[in-house]
Amino acid sequence: MKKITAVILTLILLFSITALSAAQLNELPPSAENIPAPPEINAKYALLLDLQTNTVLYEKQADIQMSPASLTKIMTALLVAESGIALDTVVTVSNKAVNVPSGSSILGLSAGDQISILDLLYGLMLRSGNDAACALAEAVSGSVESFVELMNSRAAELGMNNTHFVNPHGFADSSHYTTARDMAICSCEYIKYELLNTIASSASYEINLTSKEGSQKTFRISNTNPLLTDSQYGNYVTGLKTGFTQLAGNCIIIRYQREGRDLLSLIFNSPQGYRDNDAVALANYGYTQFSTIDLARIFQERSVVITVQNCSTEDEHNGQLELQMSSAAPLITQPQPPQPTE
């Protein structure tokens, strides 16, 4: 009786916690007077994720398909890291890699340049070089086309069900789209790699390459994310990426780490001049208005004991049941049906 009761109580408690976590990920809790209102966000699409619990704290049109612009490069960098290619591998830049669409942001590569995978990754994430994206794609998969197939395959594996890529850099294309929720999934994979975190949080980096003629070339690039060096928030913001096209508007994903909190703020299609304020306002909302409670740790520090009436006289614990708890990490999202492009 004692063991059966303990198992039932534990299962009920675990089921309740798991069900709550899954529900929180896909819809906001009902409004209540004691839940502070979120800040006014100018962005058309947004999402705030607590990385410690994988809980969505705020969302705005998070499942509507839209253009991600250069935030696409988060997936590109992730696939380079997952490929296992050595960082000191030297790539010879092809004519095709530098033949990017007019108006692209570029690292400034020339055909025949020789440059390491590591420097290409910095050029991808800091300068947002479309030429660096294509050079990396060719290094990993042999061609941009094959790499794009890998991007879509990996997106499907991750459950990014409203995403389709047509290039490795995010230059505007009506067939190249994702959602705020899908990019949160991708970003969560990205930050699992220490190197990628280091790159995304770097304010600047010195690029070294060898030209086709054999001359050495060195130049310093700066991160397009101004929040990394912001006097007020620079100590808390660690990446990840900015993006802009006329179609996508102003986009940014930031990781906000402050006093034990770890948040991901995703902003898409924000009006000119509002992007960074939107990202920080959303992150601060999560930091100031929510807190994380570890129920498993609380139970470890102060156990709950239940007394069972009419227990067996042979029970060495005299009918005393100690309730224990274990926790399981919830999924960031449940599979979402395709949503139309707005």
Segment roles from a protein language model:
Residues 22-181, 185-194, 258:
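Active-site-adjacent loops and short helices of periplasmic peptidoglycan-processing enzymes
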Residues 2-22:
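Sec-dependent N-terminal signal peptides of Gram-positive bacterial secreted proteins and lipoproteins
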Residues 17-25, 311, 330:
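Bacterial Sec-dependent signal peptides at the C-terminal "C-region" and cleavage site
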Residues 18, 116, 143, 223, ...:
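Secondary-structure junction/capping motif
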